Structure formats: structure tokens, C-alpha cells
Amino acid sequence: KNPVAMQCMDEAGFFACFVGRKQEFKYKFIVKYDNEAEQTISDPYSFDSIYSEEDLSKFDAGINYEIYEKMGAKPMTISGVEGVNFSVWAPEAMRVSVVGDFNLWDGRRHQMERLGDFGVFEIFIPGVSVGSLYKFEIKTKKGEPMLKSDPYAFYSELRPNTASIVADISGFEWSDEAWMKDRENIQSTKINESAAMNIYELHLGSWIRKEMQYDENGEEVNGSVFYNYREIAHKLSVYIKKMNYTHVEIMPVMEHPLDASWGYQVTGYYSPTSRYGTPDDFMYFINYLHKKGIGVILDWVPAHFPRDLHGLACFDGSHLYEHADPRQGAHPHWGTLIYNYARPQVSNFLISNALFWADKYHVDGIRMDAVASMLYLDYGKNSGEWVANIYGGNENLDAIEFLKHLNSIYKKKNPSSLLIAEESTAWPKVSGDLNEGGLGFDYKWNMGWMNDFLEFMKLDPYFRSGDYNALTFSLFYHYSENFILVLSHDEVVHGKATLAGKMPGATQEEKFANLRAAYGYMMTHPGKKLLFMGQEFGQMNEWNENVSLEWNLLDYDIHSKMQKYSKALNKLYLDYPALYKLDYNPDGFEWINCTSKDESTVVFLRKTENEEDTLVVVCNFTPVVYEREIGVPFKGTYTEIFNSDDKKYGGSGVGNKRAKKSVKKKVDGRENSLKIKVPPMAMVVFKWDK
């Protein structure tokens, strides 16, 4: 209660005084900085650490899976004093300070305390509140100061600004209990009870955006062109339900400085990008979609990170998160840096981040980007540009161990949330069980099918017979992994043309007939499905992240009918369990005819354990109408339930309007057969009835 004057003991700004007491006592400082009002503050160094020895030891060992609960900026009350506890891992730093809008960005004011030999720095700053801007000022061993964003920040400034923002993400009231409770069934991966999964891949900033308004001086008057997460949730959920998709997969929403990176060069792994709102807004987005029965999968990038000065690169003046040797630490394709997975604290950072999105945001799956680049030390590199492993091979043993560790812990803590790998090579057992030497993913993108099938579809129909094997080859290896058939964003950029644009044909009608046949084959082929936004209505211009999809195309008959077709095809998929239930069980698929090379046609069955569910699928990849006898599995009546050549979808209307009764005539090695009309450039489905 009686102020005691303090004397400046050092020109760096240290003050001290003598107080004649033998026991600890509570005290505050009365401080006056130049040109500022007098302040009364608590001593930041009088508060106990929030870390236990166990916390730090587990982080040091790479197994503190909830490290995000303490690392970063945490609003809290300690000993009755409100403030924010800051902490950061920077073992090679000479000094670390918290700077922000609460201390004039002055690194002398709040220098952090080093916690033992763990490389963690910490300080509790009284009076700092939610919404404050901050960074870490790191003084390197060379004496150079650097300003770094918080790797564990829950919220970040909108680009081009790069400060972290103190956030409390504990207050959102979730109401998706019913979805979370039933998610194990909704997303079942059981071999005999595989759930339907039809994913709509999208980029939040260009699926739909606002029209920019300008005043008479040409100045923008309506601010951001982006909709808020909450606004997008309402618009997107209506569209997804209308179009009969089951999930959305969102291109990375973690904070990133460069729009043109599409989110794949992340600087804020724990921050949903502020382009579309706050963390609470993003929680609302996921919660709302869950309540509408829509799953949410996030793209996640554990393979590399950008060189931006405010990010992870050379974080404490050393190569902390990346390898020091550029042959190990530099990514040649993207100009980015590769994580040093052998460092426990680095793998802990990434593992806890994946768990964070499942825990705090209720995400239904993580799709890991560029897994192939993680698995191979020589990925994208020439001889002499990479370092072999201890056995002389090109396998990245540290990355393999990291993936197994991550997948093991993730599935243990979130058994009903999915792990999906974008892996483009023939690496074995990507979706194999960890106990059997697999990597432990639930699903793997089928890049082989995508490449082969698109090359086949790009051919003039009259030349497709020469590449017929590309149509059927995927079934030779389909059951080696749990594959998702993907037609993703990567296939509609960089001069590749959109999916509609890839199709052959002198007219739009011919192109769209090809596209309908392609989608029909995809949706009846075993495996889960993914389609990139805009392709469902046949957008002709390549995707551009800076503009909205061309929704105005739906004013044209050919595009509106294409959208109507996609909607109906997705409904077919959902309505018939034979199209998904045994996706990864060989009993769920059977060829009837895969040798009609000259006609470029295939006939196959999709099945469940119940004979009554059996579907006969016929695909014709030529513009020729065939009168065809096909073998069928059972005696009975077969009704055409779907035809991509229907006039309502823009087709010519050739089909089988009446049910067909089988005859006892051996065709395609079957005792029973049907005589049908095969529409041109089309997929048709028949349902069996006794």
C-alpha cells in the first residue's frame, strides 16, 4: 500500500529496489513510460508457469498430443489476475519477447522466461485480452532480431498483415451431438458395411463470392469480396443437399499469406483463415453443415511450408522446423521447405495440429496433401540433389514413422474421423493396417485411375478401342487399397482444361454426352467419389481462385441439364447400396463383359450380400447405338432405372423404356441373357427383379 521508489540499475531499462520483508508478498508496479499515462501493473514474472515437468518432457519426446492447450497465447486468470499466458518453442534463441499492440511492439518490455533445457519460453502478461495483436520478437545467437507469428496461434490477421491475434475458442456452443454420435455409422469403413461417400471438393473463396461495388471515384464500397463462413454455410448446405453429395472437402483453410497458393502454403496451422471470418464463425460453419447431415473434410499440408519471414522458416535463427541441408530441407517443385520429421517437437507440432482440428472443430476427416513427396527422399529431385537414408535407399524413414505415429494416435482418439492420403505412387498398403505394415490411412486417392481414365476420355471415340485397357485396368489393383475415385482441382487448372473442356467433340452436345458417360462410369465403378466444384454443371473455363464459379452458365439449357444429370446420378448412388456397400470387397463387383474392345463398351455388376440389390451397368464410349445381347446373373425381369442419354439430361433419348425379361440363352458365359438397346455415348443401369 506504500509505494517504494525503484532505481534504474541498467541502461537497458532494469529497475530494482530493496523491500525489507522475509516472506513473499503481493505487489504491483506503478510505471510511467515516456509520453504515456501512469499505469499500475502486476509483475509478469511473479506468476507460476502453467507447464508441468511432465508437459515439457512429453513435448520434448514428441508425445504431448494436446500441446495446443498450453503453447501459444492463452487467455486465463492466475491468482485472480486476468491476462494472457504466452509460450513458444525457440531453443536456439538468445532471447524471446512478446510484442504487440499492448506494449508498443517494444521487445524490451516483456522478455520471456526460458523453461529449463526444453527450449520453451513463457510469460504471463496481465491486462492483455482477447483480440490483442502480437508476435514473438526473437533475438538470434547472431544478435539479430526477428519478428515471428505464433506457430500455435488460434487466429491471425488478414493478409497482407501477419500478426497473430489472441483468441479464446472455448465459448462456441456446439449442437451437432446427433451427427457426432452417429458418425461411426455415417462414415463406416467396414468391409461389408462401407458407407456412401460422395465428396464435393471446393475452395471457399471462389465457390461463390460477392460482386464488388464501387463508388463514383472508383473506390470499393462493400469491403471484402468474400462471404463469411456463416453465410457460406447457409448457401453451401442448401446446394449440397440439393445435389445429393454426402461430404464437402475444403481446400486448406489454415491461414496462408498467398491467395494463389490456394491455401497449400500454410503459415498459421492452428488458425482458420481470417479471409472468411473468425474461429467461432468457422465452428458455426461445421456445426451448421453437421446439423444438415453433411460431413466436412479438411485439406491438410504436413509435407512442406513456405519461406515467408514471419512463418516457421529459420524460426529461432536456426533450421528449427526444416532440415539444415537443402538437399533434405528444400522442396524443388514449390520452392518451399520440408519438415524435419526426426525432430520430436516438430512431429509433435504437426500431430497435435491434426488432433486439434478433430477436437476443437469436429472435422470428419483430414485429407493429407502431397503424401508421395513425404515418402520419397528423391521426390522431384535429380541425382546429387538428395541424401539417401541409412540403408542407402530413397525412402524417407522419418516421414514414414511420422505418418504411422500420427495415424495411430489420430484413430485412437477419433475412430470415426477419416484419414485420407493424396498419394500418387504405387507405395504399398497406404490404407493398410498399421499392424500389418501399412501406413494406417482409411482411404487413398486413386490417381492412377484418374490419369488413365481421363486419357481414355480425351481420345476421339473412334480411337478409344486402341486404349481399351485404360478403361478396365483399375479393377486389377482396386482391392489393393481403399481407393477414392477423384476428379479434383488439379485437373482443371494450368492449361489442362476443365473436365468438359477435355472431352472430344465438335459441338458442346457431343462434349457433354462424353462427360455424362464419364461421370456415369465413375459413379458406378467401385470406390468412394470426389468431384471438384463447377464440374457438376460443366464449367468450360478453367478454375480461377480469384473469381466465383460461373453460375450464370445455368441460364443455358445445356449446363442446367448437366447439373440436373449430376443431381440425379448422385441420387442413384445414394439410393442403391450396391453402388457403395461392398466397395472394397471383391464380392461387390463382377465383370459381365470387359472384352468388347472394338465397341468400347463394358458391362458389369454391382452387388451386395443380397441378390435383390444387384445392378447391371452398361457403358458405351462411342456415339453408336448398339442392339446388344448381354449376359445376366439371374433369370427374371430387368428394368432400366437410369440412362445418361435421357433427353432431360441433354441426351438423344435412346433407351429401354419397357422392362426386359431374360431368356435362357448363353451369352458372356452366363446361362441367361437380355437383348437391349445400348444408347450412344452413355451409361445405363438395370435393376433385377424376380
Residue locations for each model-derived region?
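Carbohydrate-interacting/catalytic domains
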Residues: 1-195, 220, 230-240, 244, ...
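An acidic- and aromatic-residue-enriched active-site/binding cleft used to recognize and process polar
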Residues: 91-93, 101-103, 139-141, 253-255, ...
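Short, acidic Gly/Pro/Ser/Thr-rich loop/turn segments
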Residues: 95, 143, 206-209, 491-495, ...
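Short glycine-biased active-site loop of nucleotidyltransferases that positions the nucleotide triphosphate
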Residues: 113, 258-263, 307-314, 431-432, ...
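Substrate-binding/active-site clefts of carbohydrate-active enzymes
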Residues: 153, 157-158, 171-172, 177-197, ...
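Conserved alpha/beta catalytic core and glycan-binding cleft of carbohydrate-active enzymes
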Residues: 159, 362-364, 379-546, 553, ...
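The feature represents the membrane-entry module of six-transmembrane cation channels
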Residues: 202, 373-374, 423, 474
